[in-house]
Amino acid sequence: YRVRVDPASGALSQVTLVSNVPNPAQLTLGVGGKTLYVASEVDDFNGGKHGGITAYRVNPADGGLTQLNQVDSQGAGPVYLSSTPDGRHLLVANYVSGSVAAFPIEADGRLGTASSVQQQQGPAGAAKPAAAVNGSFAISDHNGPHAHMIAADPSGKYVYSTDLGLDRIYQYRLDSASGKLTPNDPPFIAASSPGAGPRHFVFTPQGDGLWLINEEASTLTFYHLDKQSGLLREGKTVSALPEGY
């Protein structure tokens, strides 16, 4: 749907259907805002066994969309998309299969063939979060790899992916020319506590760290980011709940 926003009042109007795609779970604008990418969180996109990504050109005059192309997301259930800072590649996290991938963005905004695919693997995380408050019923999908987010750091040299099912934050090096993802050494850092369920994160403005939300533990953890190596180091963890909750 396209919605018009009044910049002065924030009022929303003119809700208009502009395109139909299967189960659109997440979307992101390309660098510059001229293109839009939409993830279809399915496992049978266009008759295949994976999810899909649809690329659109955005009409700057009215916000209308023109479909450019569609690609296989290289895994089942894609739930997160992000562009690299230079706008040359699109990153995708496939939740159901636990795989992540990079796609080249062509000059016209179309997506090319995947330049890199990484299947995250390992033992499943704890079924119940160790750091959860008493009475918490937060238990979900600690049964195998489930990539929940992927994003490049502000420098564009490193890529990070949270895996809720494995309780890990994966660390990759990114070749900006080829779009190849290479596991860093070590390839991941464990979540702040067993069963924490790392989900989404944001980088500091300086690019020297990130804040990560642990969905199951209801906590926020800060990770220091070494700009030379791209490696993360766990810092402080705080509760995301009100005092006494």
Predicted feature descriptions by range:
Residues 21-32, 74-89, 121-156, 191-209, ...:
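Beta-rich, blade/repeat-based domains predominating
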Residues 13-19, 66-71, 115, 134-140, ...:
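A short beta-strand motif characteristic of beta-propeller blades
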Residues 1, 51-54, 99-101, 168-170, ...:
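A short loop-to-beta-strand structural motif that recurs across blades of beta-propeller domains
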Residues 41-47, 96-99, 166-168, 217-219:
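Short glycine/acidic-enriched loop and turn motifs that connect beta-strands
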Residues 156-215:
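Loop-centered beta-sheet repeat module
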Residues 38-39, 92, 161, 212:
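Residue position within the beta-strands of beta-propeller blades
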Residues 14-87:
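Blade-loop segments of beta-propeller domains
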Residues 3-10, 56-63, 102-113, 172-181, ...:
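Short loop/turn segments immediately following beta-strands, especially the blade-tip
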